[in-house]
Amino acid sequence: MNYLPFVLQRRSTVVASAPAPGSASRIPESPTTTGSNIINIIYSQSTHPNSSPTSGSAEKFSWQQSWPSRTSAAPTHDSGTMSINTTFDLSSPSVTSGHALTEQTQVVKEGWLMKRGEHIKNWRQRYFVLHSDGRLMGYRSKPADSASTPSDFLLNNFTVRGCQIMTVDRPKPFTFIIRGLQWTTVIERTFAVESELERQQWTEAIRNVSSRLIDVGEVAMTPSEQTDMTDVDMATIAEDELSEQFSVQGTTCNSSGVKKVTLENFEFLKVLGKGTFGKVILCREKATAKLYAIKILKKEVIIQKDEVAHTLTESRVLKSTNHPFLISLKYSFQTNDRLCFVMQYVNGGELFWHLSHERIFTEDRTRFYGAEIISALGYLHSQGIIYRDLKLENLLLDKDGHIKVADFGLCKEDITYGRTTKTFCGTPEYLAPEVLDDNDYGQAVDWWGTGVVMYEMICGRLPFYNRDHDVLFTLILVEEVKFPRNITDEAKNLLAGLLAKDPKKRLGGGKDDVKEIQAHPFFASINWTDLVLKKIPPPFKPQVTSDTDTRYFDKEFTGESVELTPPDPTGPLGSIAEEPLFPQFSYQGDMASTLGTSSHISTSTSLASMQ
C-alpha cells in the first residue's frame, strides 16, 4: 500500500456481513486506503474499491476457461479439478440455532481443518462437517450433532455444489482452495490439513458431493433464517425486502407537489474526496448560503459491492442521533442512480493528520479529545448503538477544534448492556481481543478502541503493531501493553483499564458503561456538562482562515473542477425520483425553513451522472 509519508500509517477498515456468514462471520473487505482517498475517511465511506464482493447469501458463479492472473507464482492446479462451465454455489447463510438434517442427508466427512481468512490472512482451526446435500459446515468445537448445536458454535456454512478445487502448498503445506467467480471477481475459500492423505480425502469427498449434486440437478439446502438483519448485506435481501429496508423517516416525494431537495438546490464549490462509490463535494445551499459536504454515492456500485446494509445503517444512525461531537445529517435524497447525503461540513482535519505532523499530543490535549470522544460514544451507547470502528482517521476536528466522530457504516444497533453481537468488523490494529477470539461482544468493544486512540495520542504509536496480521493479532490477544516512562500514573492507569483484555474487567465494561470512565482520576478536571455545552475551550484551534478553507484536505481533489453531467443533455441537473429499489429514502429535516419559496424544484426523472 502507498501510505502518506507520516510517522503514522493509515489503517484500513475491515467489514463483514451478517453473523457467521460463510467465513466465521468474516466476509471482510480488504480496503486500500491511501492518503488521498479522503472519501473513505472523512464522511462515512468506510468501504473501498478493492473489496471482494462476498456476501452472506448464496453466491452464484460461472466458471470460465481463462483464469485471471493473480500472482507471479501461480498455484498449481489439481489434476482432478472440476470441468468448466459448471455452476459454483458457495452460500453463506446466517447462523441459526441448528440445521436439522433431512432423512436423505448424511454426513459424508468430518474433522478438523485450518481455514484462512479471505483478507486478513490469519488461520483458524475449525471443525467441519460435509453433508451429502452439499453443506460444508464449520464449528468452533466438535458438535454433538448439527441439529442441536448452539448457534454460537456454528461459524461457517458453505454449499459446495459444482465447486472447483485446487491443491497448493502455499502459504501452508497441504492446502486446498475452493474457487469460483462472482461478477468478474475470483472468490476463494482456503483450507489446510496436516498431511497429503488428509487433503486427498477431503478434496475427493467434496468433489464427489459436488459432482453428484450437479449430475442429479439437486439444489443445495440453504437456511433462510436471518438472525441479524441489521448486519445482513445486499445479496441476502430480495428486492421487495430491500425496498422496505430503505423506508426511513423524512419527507418524501408525492404527487401533491411537496417540495424536495435536489442537487439543483446547491452550488458546488470543491471536490473534497472521491472513490469508487462516488464523491464528496463541498457545496453551498443556495437558499441559505450555508456550507455542507454532500456525499454522492453510486447505487449500482453499492449494490454490486454488497454495501446496502452499511449504507442503511449509516442512514439510520445519522437520522436518529444528535450530539455535538457526532457528524450530523441535514438532508438525504436520491437521483435515479445516486444516493445523496447532505452532511455537516467540518474543515479542521483528521486527528490522524494532526498527530502525524506533531508525533504526540500532551496529556492535557489528549484528555480533552478523549473526553469528547467518550462523551460521543457514551451517547451512542445510551441509544443502543455501538460504533465499532474507532480510529484516528474517523475523528475530525471542526473549525474551533472540537471532535466530530464520522463514519457510521459499521455501527450496530439494538446493543444495550448485556446484549451482544458477533460480526467480525473493524480495523485490524484496533480490533478488540474478544472480536479476534470469535467471542460475542458488546459495548466494551468501543472502550478498547478508545484506549487505542488515546494511547496513540499520548505515546505517538499504536499499543500493538506488526505488519504481519497474524503477529499483530497474537500481540493483541496475549501481549501486555507497555508504557513509556514519561507518562503520568493517572494516564497509565486509564490506558491499562481501557486496554484490559477481558471485556468484563475493562474500564467501562460494566453496567455503568461510560460513567465508570468519566469517574476515572485522569478526567478529574473535566466538567462533563460544560464539555457537552462546549464551554471548555479546545487546546488547539485549526489554522483555517474561512469556512471554505480546505487546507486539511488533499489538494489532488480540491484542485479539481466539479463537473456534474446529466446523461440526457435535455434533462435538468439533479432531478430525482424515488425509484422502486430505494423508496422513501429521502430525509429532508426542517425543509420548509431552509429552501424558501424561490427555490427551483425539479420534478422530472432524468439522471444526474457524475464524471
UniProtKB/Swiss-Prot annotation:
Domain Protein kinase: 266-523
Disulphide-bridged cysteine pairs: none
Modified residues annotated as Phosphoserine in this record: 30, 586
Entries under InterPro entries matching the protein: AGC-kinase_C (IPR000961), Kinase-like_dom_sf (IPR011009), PH-like_dom_sf (IPR011993), PH_domain (IPR001849), PH_PKB (IPR039026), Pkinase_C (IPR017892), Prot_kinase_dom (IPR000719), Protein_kinase_ATP_BS (IPR017441)
Pfam family, one: PH
Protein location: Cytoplasm, Cytosol; Cell membrane
SUPFAM superfamilies named in the record: PH domain-like, Protein kinase-like (PK-like)
Active site, per annotation: 389
Domain AGC-kinase C-terminal span(s) in chain numbering: 524-597
Residues that coordinate or bind ATP: 272-280, 295
GO molecular function annotation: ATP binding; protein serine kinase activity; protein serine/threonine kinase activity
UniProt note: domains: Binding of the PH domain to the phosphatidylinositol 3-kinase alpha (PI(3)K) results in its targeting to the plasma membrane.
Purpose: Serine/threonine kinase involved in various developmental processes. During early embryogenesis, acts as a survival protein. During mid-embryogenesis, phosphorylates and activates trh, a transcription factor required for tracheal cell fate determination. Also regulates tracheal cell migration. Later in development, acts downstream of PI3K and Pk61C/PDK1 in the insulin receptor transduction pathway which regulates cell growth and organ size, by phosphorylating and antagonizing FOXO transcription factor. Controls follicle cell size during oogenesis.
Protein name: RAC serine/threonine-protein kinase
Organism listed in the record: Drosophila melanogaster (Fruit fly)
